[in-house]
Swiss-Prot record:
GO molecular function: ATP binding; ATP hydrolysis activity; ATP-dependent DNA damage sensor activity; endonuclease activity; mismatched DNA binding; ribosomal large subunit binding; rRNA binding
Top EC class for this record: hydrolase
Family according to the record: Belongs to the DNA mismatch repair MutS family. MutS2 subfamily.
Gene: mutS2
Annotated positions binding ATP: 332-339
Gene3D superfamilies listed in its UniProt record: 3.30.1370.110, P-loop containing nucleotide triphosphate hydrolases
CDD domains: ABC_MutS2, ATP-synt_Fo_b
This protein's name: Endonuclease MutS2
Purpose: Endonuclease that is involved in the suppression of homologous recombination and thus may have a key role in the control of bacterial genetic diversity. Acts as a ribosome collision sensor, splitting the ribosome into its 2 subunits. Detects stalled/collided 70S ribosomes which it binds and splits by an ATP-hydrolysis driven conformational change. Acts upstream of the ribosome quality control system (RQC), a ribosome-associated complex that mediates the extraction of incompletely synthesized nascent chains from stalled ribosomes and their subsequent degradation. Probably generates substrates for RQC.
Assembly, per entry: Homodimer. Binds to stalled ribosomes, contacting rRNA.
Naturally occurring in which organism (per UniProt): Clostridium tetani (strain Massachusetts / E88)
EC number of the protein: 3.1.-.-, 3.6.4.-
Length: 786
């Protein structure tokens, strides 16, 4: 598709709107590269995938895109075997989690509507739950690793806690001892070492190492000698901790490297799905529908709207082309809205051919064009010193050299910018050249000569945009088959031009021209009514077809459900018979055992009675199973037209409308539908007896399950996190847990604030606090339950 048409028809503005619905920069790059596809198969496939995504949005809600990131830079680091940072690993895990959840989201039960294209895309997803869980279990936040990431790290941190506790006790003792010499009775930390704020004049009173001083020089930060060894031990442990963390990160990065191809494919699938669902959301937001795509150049756009015009102001218009004519000449005044019609037609086609649903009514048809050419607007080059006419002609020459039978050509004010007589003649010649090549052409003009050309030329049709002379505004409604009327006299009169001047002007025009204008006016009013009636009739027909299809689908579902129920009842009966026979065999076995053991004849008699009861039960069940295979009621022997009979297949009464044909079928009225059925399938209406329906009691079972002592919210948005936490706290309370941990990560703090706001109001929460060192710090909240 040539870039000039995409620019002139403002497809880039559509893409900017589409970007507003994507989640990742990777998907935005896909949007940037979006353009019409080069073959019909691709167009239809991408339209179908958009429609499938729209259906999933409507039936299953928002897809699981929480925590989807653009990790292309991270994957480049992995490809170079570089060690990833904790935050980068979390983004990789989030992509894996999203791809896994998306596979569940798209997965369907047998009776659900298939979404073939999206399901095929999701086939590319390979689950790496082990790697995903490894990362989430080890990495708590962008800058924190879990204590239990390894036994060694756990031991180091436990030693750190013990050393820090000892050091704090020791330093508190020193604070009390040296308090007369301190600026404040506190301790502080400088360079990971505990120090005391000693007044400068007493530095000799506190033996130790000076690490820093205040900006005024009045305070020295001294590490007492008695703390040096403990501080050194802590420093040593911190270095070991850092080394172990680096080892753990290297190990995780290696796992990502070993699965790089799978991670890469999963990420690309998620980004593609992000793009597809953005198309669906765009369609929903703009009331777009799925068009049919014609390979024969047939266009039938029903109530098409320009997608860039305000929805409250845009006027829908019908545009059709390619069946009865291949060229459409839209005439009328310059302010008549002709250019909007051109742009609407062109932009709707570019959208549809790019896999986007179109802003038009259902059952609209677009044509598959390999090229769309547009000469719209005044785009002359100042540098080239081109006039308006020359600028247009340069573009027209290019179009003529490239256009063929698979092209749509749009001309705005063809032949304008030069002498009217020469311009009109040139316009007709250009149109003829392209028409002979079987191009589909829509051209606007205000030259009257082109009206005559359209009237006398095969495959060319006149059209105009309706104009309201009362308001002096175009209605933007396209009237195909009616040439445009200038309305110059009516407009001038409305604006206050004298009646005498208007009459004199009319006298200067040939009477034939005036009659022609009057004829056009009459044709316009008749055409509008005929067009409205035809379109309304078409809509009624489509609605009737839709209802018919819907009824037939329901009929099919009823029949399938009935067969399933019948089969289920038969299976249940067989199962009961089998159980009863097994019970009888057990009784016989017991009888033989009793005989061997010398039991009394009374005991034997009782067992025989039980056996007879079971035999009776088996006989009844077998009869019931046999009856299930028979249709209800008696067969019909005589046919009486208009008689009400019973049709078991539909489980409803029907009326006989005809005698049996040579296939043994009769026509019956079932509700609003007339259908043919086998005479043998009908039963007398008085025979089917409705049994009293007994409600089944439902057994309520209390389901208890193990509740974890922590919940991981990373990768969720605030709303989802609050909902899941609220539900989790209720389950934890019922399970008897007294203390739980909510992992929200550090990040920007928005998620933590949302959780804290919810905890303040939760009825099961007694108290809560941020995690301490080793628990996860500010990346977790510890909750005490009532």
């Amino acid at each position: 598709m040539n870039e000039r048409a995409l620019k002139v028809l403002e497809f880039y503005k559509i893409k900017e709107k589409l970007k507003g619905f994507v989640k990742t920069n990777a998907a935005k790059d896909i949007v940037d590269n979006l353009k019409p596809y080069t073959n019909l198969y691709e167009v239809e496939m991408h339209l179908e995938e958009t429609m499938e995504a729209l259906d999933l949005l409507q039936t299953k809600g928002e897809p699981p895109f929480e925590g989807v990131y653009d990790i292309r830079d991270i994957l480049i680091r992995v490809e170079k075997a570089m060690v990833l940072l904790p935050g980068q690993l979390l983004k990789v895990a989030s992509i894996l989690k999203s791809s896994r959840r998306f596979k569940d989201y798209v997965g369907r039960k047998h009776e659900e509507t298939p979404h073939k294209n999206i399901e095929d895309i999701c086939e590319g997803i390979e689950l790496l739950k082990g790697l995903e869980e490894s990362i989430f279990n080890i990495v708590i936040s962008d800058d924190e690793i879990a204590d239990r990431a390894s036994l060694k790290l756990y031991g180091i941190r436990r030693s750190l806690r013990d050393k820090n506790d000892s050091l704090r006790d020791r330093v508190n003792s020193l604070v009390r001892k040296y308090s007369p010499y301190l600026q404040e009775s506190i301790y502080t930390i400088r360079g990971d070492r505990y120090v005391l704020p000693v007044r400068a004049e007493h530095k000799g009173s506190v033996p130790g190492l000076v690490h820093d001083q205040s900006s005024s020089g009045a305070t020295l930060f001294i590490e007492p000698m008695s703390l040096v060894n403990l501080n050194n031990e802590i420093k040593e442990l911190l270095l070991k901790e850092r080394e172990e963390i680096e080892r753990i990160l290297e190990e995780l990065s290696l796992k990502v490297y070993n699965n790089l191809d799978v991670v890469n494919v999963n990420a690309k699938v998620i980004w593609e799905l992000d793009f597809i669902f953005a198309k669906a959301k765009f369609a929903s937001h703009n009331n777009c529908t799925l068009p049919k795509v014609s390979e024969d150049g047939i266009v039938d756009i029903i109530e098409g709207k320009h997608p860039l015009i305000d929805t409250e102001k845009v006027v829908p218009t019908d545009i059709y082309l390619g069946k009865d004519f291949t060229s459409l000449i839209i005439t009328g005044p310059n302010t008549g809205g002709k250019t909007v019609t051109l742009k609407t037609l062109g932009l709707i086609h570019i959208m549809g051919l790019s896999g986007l649903l179109i802003p038009a009514k259902e059952n609209s048809t677009i044509a598959f064009f390999e090229e769309i050419f547009a000469d719209i607007g005044d785009e002359q080059s100042i540098e080239q010193s081109l006039s308006t006419f020359s600028s247009h002609m340069v573009n027209i020459v290019d179009i003529i050299s490239k256009a063929d039978h698979k092209s749509l050509v749009l001309f705005d004010e063809l032949g304008a910018g030069t002498d009217p007589t020469e311009g009109a003649a040139l316009a007709i010649s250009i149109l003829e050249n392209l028409r002979r090549r079987k191009c589909k052409i829509v051209a606007t003009t205000h030259y009257s000569e082109l009206k005559g050309y359209a009237l006398k030329t095969e495959d060319v049709e006149n059209a105009s945009v309706e104009f309201d002379v009362e308001t002096l505004r175009p209605t933007y409604r396209l009237l195909i088959g009616i040439p445009g009327k200038s309305n110059a006299f009516e407009i001038s009169k409305r604006l206050g031009l004298g009646e005498d001047i208007i009459e004199e002007a009319k006298n200067n025009i040939e009477s034939d021209s005036l009659k022609f204008e009057a004829l056009i006016e009459k044709l316009q009013s008749k055409s509008i009514k005929a067009s409205d009636d035809a379109r309304r009739a078409e809509m009624y027909k489509l609605e009737a077809d839709r209802l018919k299809d819907k009824y037939e689908d329901k009929l099919k579902i009823v029949e399938e459900t009935r067969e399933k129920l019948l089969k289920g009842a038969q299976e249940e009966a067989k199962k009961l018979i089998k159980e009863a026979k097994e019970e009888a065999d057990e009784i016989l076995k017991n009888i033989r055992e009793l005989e061997k053991m010398g039991y009394s004849s009374t005991a034997r008699q009782k067992l025989e009675e039980e056996r007879k009861k079971l035999n009776s039960k088996i006989h009844k069940l077998e009869e019931k199973e046999e009856n299930l295979n028979k249709e209800k009621g008696k067969k019909i022997k005589e046919i009486n037209l208009g008689e009400e009979v019973y049709l078991p297949k539909l489980d409803q009464k029907v009326i006989i409308l005809s005698k049996p044909d040579n296939r043994g079928e009769v026509q019956v009225q079932a509700g609003i539908m007339k259908i043919n059925v086998k005479l043998d399938d009908l039963r007398l209406v008085d025979k089917p007896k409705e049994e009293n329906k007994k409600g089944r009691k439902r057994e309520a079972k209390l389901r208890m399950r193990t509740v974890e002592s922590e919940i991981d919210l990373r990768g969720m948005d605030s709303m989802e996190a609050v909902y899941n936490t609220d539900k989790y706290l209720d389950e934890a309370y019922v399970a008897g847990l007294k203390e739980v941990t909510v992992i929200h990560g550090k990040g920007t703090g928005i998620l933590r604030k949302s959780i804290n706001d919810m905890l303040k109001r939760h009825p099961q929460v007694k108290n809560y606090r941020l995690g301490e060192y080793g628990e996860g710090g500010t990346g977790v909240t510890v909750v005490e339950l009532k």
